[in-house]
Every structure is written in structure tokens, then in C-alpha cells.
Amino acid sequence: MECLRLARAALDEMLAHARAAHPEECCGAVLELGGRDVVRRFTNIQARLHREDPASHPRDAETAYAPEPKELFAALREGEAPGARVKVFYHSHTRVGAYFSGEDRARAMFGDEPAYPEVTYVVVSDSRTPGEVRAFRWDEGARDFVEVPIEVC
């Protein structure tokens, strides 16, 4: 499977976002705009969701994320412009390494299909293994998300 090519500045921005959000998880997207990788940070509203309805949202923002819908939709619209695309959705793990958890997979799915099959999901760790970054993409043959190498350029 093809690797994820990611600009150094975008990777650095994702890591900075994770450090700034700690001890909460961060989330965002990388858009490809005119051949450049541009990071869009999203507000993690998981703490508010948990506070307002802990039965429906049992995890707080230290162990889960929920992007602010208006920010997410703005990035999706921006990615639909000519010469643009949503390249990456990213989030951080604050207490564990950078792996694609069952919760991450569930959030990336729409029923039995990936919600955004063309988008790569990046998980960064800012605690247990600071700076660890791993990428995952849908593999139709495996019917699952598989790890792909990251080429930083």
C-alpha cells in the first residue's frame, strides 16, 4: 500500500497541537490545498459532551475526541474545492501509544464501510511515547484499516 507523504511543517503542527491540548486529546485534519499540506485544528468538544450526557458519552476528552461539527464541516467543504482534498484526519492519544484503537475504527466507519475511504487517519502520541506518529488507511481487500508508512518531505 502506498505511503502517506506528509510535509514536515504539517507533522510539526500536529505534534504541537497534541502537546498544547494535553492532557486532553486533540483532533484535526490536513488538507491538500494547491499541492501544499495545510493543518486545520478542530476544537475537541468531548469534555462538554461527557459533562452534558455522561451516559451517552462515557469517555471524557482525556481518552476520546469529538471534533466541533462546524469546524469539521468547514474543513470538508474546503477539501471539496478544485485542486483540494482532505488528506488526513488526525488525533492524539494522551495515555497510550499511537495505535488505531477499536474506538478510532468505530468513529471512522459508517456502518460496514469507511466514512472517508480516501482519507488517511494519523494518530500521534504525546505522553507514553512522545512524538510517536502512525498512519492508517482503509484496505478494501482486508476490509480494515492497516498501517501505512509515513514519508516526511
What do the predicted segments below correspond to?
Residues 91-95:
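Histidine-centered divalent metal-coordination motifs
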Residues 1-86, 97-153:
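Conserved beta-strand-loop surface patch within small alpha/beta domains used
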